[in-house]
Amino acid sequence: MQAQESKRPGTLYISWGYNTEWYTNNSIHIDQPSLNSKYEIVKIRGEDHRGWDKSLLKQDLTIPQYNFRIGYFFNQNQDLAIEINFDHTKFIVRQGQQAQIKGIFTGNQVDNTVNFTEINGFYYFLNNGANFLLFNIVKRYPIYTTANNTFKLDLMGKVGIGPVIPHVQNSLFGLANDPSFQFGGWNTGIETALKATIYRYVYLELSQKIDYSRYSNLKVYQGTARQNFACYELILSLGLNLKLR
């Protein structure tokens, strides 16, 4: 009886792309015990900062809002994968809006509006990244394949959970924090994509994603901030498949 060597097919893939986002309005909760301040900035509006729409080829690839994926299709049908999914997104509180401040500030009850501008002492950036990291399960649904297998079109479904790693920079009432990266909470996301593969190895992927993030213990001057928001994201990526045997 002849033993047969069991071969488990697999495909490693890697991609790089760029994104844009739209965020839900959200409240930022500030706690500064040493200043006797505990208040919220109510239903503030935030926006992204694409970067790739201005002189993309004249700056480092990692300065604009980018996306990185690395994954592995592990089953016989090559339709199930695990994936590390990183989105370098940016969240910036929109300058010039009238922001409601409600709670306790320096021991006094407040409920008023401020002009949220840098010249007035206010800015709030997750600008070197709101930074969503997800560990995904991926499912592939074939749509179309040419007879000679030189072109394939697939629908991809992805779902995952993971940490957020924001870069936090802000000033509130003229009091600025020390900007830094930190582990700042968690996020979960669901993503669908159309994936066009050419000659088996190169692919272009157009994705849409809904992500929900909860941030906590974000550094502000002598205190912390917390917030949560959802965002809708569009992503275009270029990738490479590597067959493993």
Language model feature labels by segment:
Residues A3-F74, P166, I235-R245:
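Short glycine/proline- and aromatic-enriched beta-strand/turn motifs that initiate or cap beta-hairpins
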Residues S6-I14, Q78-I82, N131, N149-L155, ...:
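Outer-envelope beta-barrel architecture signal
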Residues R8-L12, T62-Y66, N127-F135, Q182-T188, ...:
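Residues that define the transmembrane beta-barrel architecture of outer-membrane proteins
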Residues N26-I30, S34-K43, A193-R245:
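Predominantly the C-terminal beta-signal and adjacent terminal strand-loop region
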Residues N26-P33, Q95-I101, P166-A176, N217-G223:
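Outer-membrane beta-barrel translocator domains and adjoining extracellular loop/strand segments
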Residues Q32-F122, T197-Y199, Y203, K209-Y215:
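Glycine- and aromatic-enriched membrane insertion/assembly motifs of diderm outer-membrane
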Residues D53-L56, I119-F125, L172-F181, L218-N228:
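Extracellular loop and loop/strand-boundary signature of outer-membrane beta-barrel proteins
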Residues R69-N170, G239-R245:
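Gram-negative (and chloroplast) outer-membrane scaffold detector with strong preference
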